[in-house]
């Protein structure tokens, strides 16, 4: 049976003053162990938790961002399937926007660094094709639903 994990693809909209436009930036965390890969916050589902509860708890634990500091974006949910440490894994991601683009990120010991990145740079850091695709799909979803 596949391991099940859930997380949030967290983003902010940063104003670019000179061009009077906004840029979407994604939050990626760098793992402290293994190959030091970059991903959004995520973690394993605990007994009695819903998938979304898991995603919110893991975001608070790994990045110090609480549920009240986020807006979950309706209509976007992606399920990634891959092999991690020789075991099948399923990770479900939702999109979430920080309410304050200057929110403080407080890393747990599981991570050693974080970065806010525009799509192209985020995809370069995300080493796994499934994660790159999820970031691209999230960006496309946000651009297509912008008001």
Swiss-Prot record:
User: By its UniProt entry, which SUPFAM superfamilies does this protein fall under?
Assistant: Nudix
Q: Does the keyword Hydrolase apply?
A: yes
Q: Which residues carry this modification: N-acetylalanine?
A: 2
Q: Which reaction does it catalyse?
A: P(1),P(4)-bis(5'-guanosyl) tetraphosphate + H2O = GMP + GTP + 2 H(+); a 5'-end CoA-ribonucleoside in mRNA + H2O = a 5'-end phospho-adenosine-phospho-ribonucleoside in mRNA + (R)-4'-phosphopantetheine + 2 H(+); a 5'-end FAD-phospho-ribonucleoside in mRNA + H2O = a 5'-end phospho-adenosine-phospho-ribonucleoside in mRNA + FMN + 2 H(+)
Nudix box, short sequence motif: residues: 43-64
Instruction: Spell out the molecular function terms from Gene Ontology.
Output: bis(5'-nucleosyl)-tetraphosphatase (asymmetrical) activity; GTP binding
Q: Which cofactor does it need?
A: a divalent metal cation
Report the EC number(s), separated by commas if there are several.
Answer: 3.6.1.17
Q: Which UniProt keywords apply?
A: Acetylation, GTP-binding, Hydrolase, Nucleotide-binding
Instruction: State the similarity comment.
Output: Belongs to the Nudix hydrolase family.
The name on file for this protein is: Bis(5'-nucleosyl)-tetraphosphatase [asymmetrical]
Query: What is the species of this protein?
Result: Bos taurus
Residue span, Nudix hydrolase domain: 2-139
Fetch the CDD domains from UniProt.
NUDIX_Ap4A_Nudt2 (cd03428)
Q: Which GO terms describe its biological process?
A: AMP biosynthetic process; ATP biosynthetic process
